[in-house]
Amino acid sequence: MQKKKAFNPLLYLTSIVFLSWSISFSFKKSMESLVIHWWNAEQSEVFLNDIQEKSALEKFIELEELLFLDEMIKESPDIHIQKLRIGIHKETIQLVKMYNEGHIHTILNFLTNIISFAILSVFYILGNEQLVILNSWVREFIYNLSDTIKAFCILLLTDLCIGFHSPHGWELMIGSVYKDFGFSHNNQIISGLVSTFPVILDTIFKYLIFRYLNRVSPSLVVIYHSIND
């Protein structure tokens, strides 16, 4: 009976993940043609924001300088100007196509994120009872573990999320989210988030250890500090 009670919430959690992903994927595929038509036919703006426009201008200037240098080296001065104009025209078209596809991808991702959030909200509201059962099952499972295993899991989790090697993972994750919402890649902003966000998590986690675990299981705190040292 207990296994059945635990199985139902797990099945419900699996259905949440699978259905939200499948519905979001289907929505993205069905909306792709509409977004492409809307962006290419009815949208007059080339860039989504000023940051992207500045980034495109910098790439265009860099491209123009490289093509100019390449033509100056390969050809004589009397014919390189015409080839330079043709090369700049071709590369400009490719640059515009690249940004155009990127904007469509950003809009689709933004709409998909909204749909995913709405689906998860509906599942949370309708299946609150199942989630409560799952939460109690997880709490019971963790409670039955020994203090040594608990300390090991806590140490492993903290090293993965806020440990010495975690900034590399945070940089990839924040950069992916940053790009997913249509922002141009900015090393300064991403580095700032990577350097501050894990520190905030580390502070919160240490506070929870001091406030909660020290009250519930003092031996676990002692084992954790012994392993950590």
UniProtKB/Swiss-Prot annotation:
Primary localization: plastid
Cellular location(s): Plastid, Chloroplast inner membrane
Membrane topology of the entry: Multi-pass membrane protein
Keywords in alphabetical order: Antiport, Chloroplast, Hydrogen ion transport, Ion transport, Membrane, Plastid, Plastid inner membrane, Potassium, Potassium transport, Transmembrane, Transmembrane helix, Transport
Residues annotated as transmembrane: 7-27, 107-127, 154-174, 189-209
Entries under PANTHER family matching the protein: CHLOROPLAST ENVELOPE MEMBRANE PROTEIN (PTHR33650:SF2), CHLOROPLAST ENVELOPE MEMBRANE PROTEIN-RELATED (PTHR33650)
The protein's role, per its UniProt record: Contributes to K(+)/H(+) antiport activity by supporting proton efflux to control proton extrusion and homeostasis in chloroplasts in a light-dependent manner to modulate photosynthesis. Prevents excessive induction of non-photochemical quenching (NPQ) under continuous-light conditions. Indirectly promotes efficient inorganic carbon uptake into chloroplasts.
Family membership: Belongs to the CemA family.
Protein name in the entry: Potassium/proton antiporter CemA
Species classification: Eukaryota, Viridiplantae, Streptophyta, Embryophyta, Tracheophyta
